[in-house]
Protein backbone atom coordinates (compact mmCIF):
# COMPACT_ATOMS: atom_id res chain seq x y z
CA UNK A 1 0.00 0.00 0.00
CA UNK A 2 1.50 3.41 -0.97
CA UNK A 3 2.36 5.89 1.73
CA UNK A 4 0.47 9.15 1.37
CA UNK A 5 1.79 12.46 2.59
CA UNK A 6 -0.36 15.41 3.61
CA UNK A 7 -0.93 17.99 0.93
CA UNK A 8 1.78 20.61 1.15
CA UNK A 9 1.11 24.28 0.65
CA UNK A 10 3.01 25.84 -2.22
CA UNK A 11 5.42 28.55 -1.19
CA UNK A 12 5.91 29.86 -4.69
CA UNK A 13 4.79 33.43 -5.36
CA UNK A 14 2.06 33.77 -7.95
CA UNK A 15 2.33 36.70 -10.35
CA UNK A 16 -0.67 38.89 -9.72
CA UNK A 17 -2.02 41.56 -12.03
CA UNK A 18 -3.81 43.22 -9.14
CA UNK A 19 -1.70 45.52 -6.99
CA UNK A 20 -2.14 47.40 -3.74
CA UNK A 21 -4.15 50.59 -4.27
CA UNK A 22 -6.09 49.31 -7.31
CA UNK A 23 -9.86 49.67 -7.42
CA UNK A 24 -11.52 46.30 -7.97
CA UNK A 25 -15.04 44.90 -8.25
CA UNK A 26 -16.09 41.56 -6.74
CA UNK A 27 -17.51 39.35 -9.50
CA UNK A 28 -18.74 36.37 -7.46
CA UNK A 29 -19.75 35.41 -3.93
CA UNK A 30 -21.83 37.06 -1.24
CA UNK A 31 -20.28 40.49 -1.91
CA UNK A 32 -20.84 40.33 -5.68
CA UNK A 33 -20.99 43.78 -7.27
CA UNK A 34 -19.20 45.63 -4.45
CA UNK A 35 -16.21 47.79 -5.34
CA UNK A 36 -13.32 48.78 -3.14
CA UNK A 37 -9.63 49.53 -2.93
CA UNK A 38 -7.09 46.74 -2.53
CA UNK A 39 -5.51 47.18 0.91
CA UNK A 40 -3.07 44.27 0.68
CA UNK A 41 -2.08 41.47 -1.68
CA UNK A 42 -1.08 37.96 -0.59
CA UNK A 43 0.84 36.58 -3.61
CA UNK A 44 1.74 33.21 -2.05
CA UNK A 45 -1.94 32.46 -1.41
CA UNK A 46 -3.16 34.31 -4.57
CA UNK A 47 -5.55 36.38 -2.45
CA UNK A 48 -6.30 40.08 -1.90
CA UNK A 49 -7.82 42.09 0.94
CA UNK A 50 -10.37 44.62 -0.35
CA UNK A 51 -11.73 47.52 1.68
CA UNK A 52 -15.35 46.94 2.75
CA UNK A 53 -15.55 43.42 1.28
CA UNK A 54 -15.78 40.06 3.12
CA UNK A 55 -16.20 41.64 6.57
CA UNK A 56 -15.59 39.28 9.51
CA UNK A 57 -16.39 39.84 13.19
CA UNK A 58 -13.82 38.80 15.75
CA UNK A 59 -14.27 38.73 19.52
CA UNK A 60 -11.12 39.88 21.34
CA UNK A 61 -10.45 38.95 24.95
CA UNK A 62 -9.14 41.60 27.34
CA UNK A 63 -5.34 41.57 27.51
CA UNK A 64 -4.85 43.54 30.72
CA UNK A 65 -6.67 43.52 34.01
CA UNK A 66 -9.45 46.09 34.12
CA UNK A 67 -9.73 46.20 30.33
CA UNK A 68 -12.93 44.98 28.75
CA UNK A 69 -13.19 42.67 25.76
CA UNK A 70 -14.33 44.05 22.44
CA UNK A 71 -15.78 43.03 19.10
CA UNK A 72 -13.62 43.91 16.09
CA UNK A 73 -14.77 43.90 12.47
CA UNK A 74 -12.12 43.46 9.81
CA UNK A 75 -11.78 42.57 6.14
CA UNK A 76 -10.85 38.98 5.33
CA UNK A 77 -9.07 37.99 2.14
CA UNK A 78 -10.79 37.16 -1.15
CA UNK A 79 -9.32 34.95 -3.87
CA UNK A 80 -7.80 37.04 -6.66
CA UNK A 81 -9.86 35.22 -9.29
CA UNK A 82 -13.05 36.58 -7.69
CA UNK A 83 -12.19 40.23 -8.37
CA UNK A 84 -11.68 42.30 -11.53
CA UNK A 85 -10.02 45.65 -11.98
CA UNK A 86 -12.57 48.46 -12.07
CA UNK A 87 -12.47 51.66 -14.10
CA UNK A 88 -13.73 54.61 -12.06
CA UNK A 89 -14.08 56.77 -15.19
CA UNK A 90 -16.26 54.38 -17.22
CA UNK A 91 -17.79 52.54 -14.20
CA UNK A 92 -17.02 49.11 -15.68
CA UNK A 93 -14.98 46.06 -14.61
CA UNK A 94 -12.47 44.67 -17.06
CA UNK A 95 -9.74 42.10 -17.53
CA UNK A 96 -6.11 43.21 -17.66
CA UNK A 97 -3.63 43.09 -20.51
CA UNK A 98 0.11 43.61 -20.13
CA UNK A 99 1.46 46.01 -22.74
CA UNK A 100 5.17 46.41 -23.47
CA UNK A 101 6.08 50.02 -24.28
CA UNK A 102 8.73 51.04 -26.84
CA UNK A 103 11.25 51.68 -24.07
CA UNK A 104 10.74 48.10 -22.78
CA UNK A 105 8.67 48.95 -19.70
CA UNK A 106 5.51 46.98 -18.96
CA UNK A 107 2.18 48.71 -18.37
CA UNK A 108 -1.19 47.30 -17.38
CA UNK A 109 -4.15 48.16 -19.60
CA UNK A 110 -7.86 47.47 -19.14
CA UNK A 111 -9.09 45.39 -22.07
CA UNK A 112 -12.60 46.87 -22.30
CA UNK A 113 -11.72 50.55 -22.03
CA UNK A 114 -8.09 50.64 -23.19
CA UNK A 115 -7.26 52.72 -20.11
CA UNK A 116 -3.65 52.47 -18.86
CA UNK A 117 -3.35 51.76 -15.14
CA UNK A 118 0.38 52.20 -14.46
Swiss-Prot record:
Family the entry assigns: Belongs to the universal ribosomal protein uL24 family.
Record keywords, A-Z: Ribonucleoprotein, Ribosomal protein, RNA-binding, rRNA-binding
Name the UniProt record assigns to this protein: Large ribosomal subunit protein uL24
Keyword RNA-binding: yes
Known function: One of two assembly initiator proteins, it binds directly to the 5'-end of the 23S rRNA, where it nucleates assembly of the 50S subunit. One of the proteins that surrounds the polypeptide exit tunnel on the outside of the subunit.
Single annotated GO MF: rRNA binding
PROSITE patterns assigned to the protein according to its UniProt record, in alphabetical order: RIBOSOMAL_L24 (PS01108)
One GO BP: translation
Subunit organization: Part of the 50S ribosomal subunit.
Signal sequence extent: none
Listed PANTHER family: MITOCHONDRIAL RIBOSOMAL PROTEIN L24
Superkingdom of source: Bacteria
GO cellular component, one term: ribonucleoprotein complex
InterPro entries xrefs: KOW (IPR005824), Rib_uL2_dom2 (IPR014722), Ribosomal_uL24 (IPR003256), Ribosomal_uL24_CS (IPR005825), Ribosomal_uL24_KOW (IPR041988), Translation_prot_SH3-like_sf (IPR008991)
SUPFAM superfamilies in alphabetical order: Translation proteins SH3-like domain
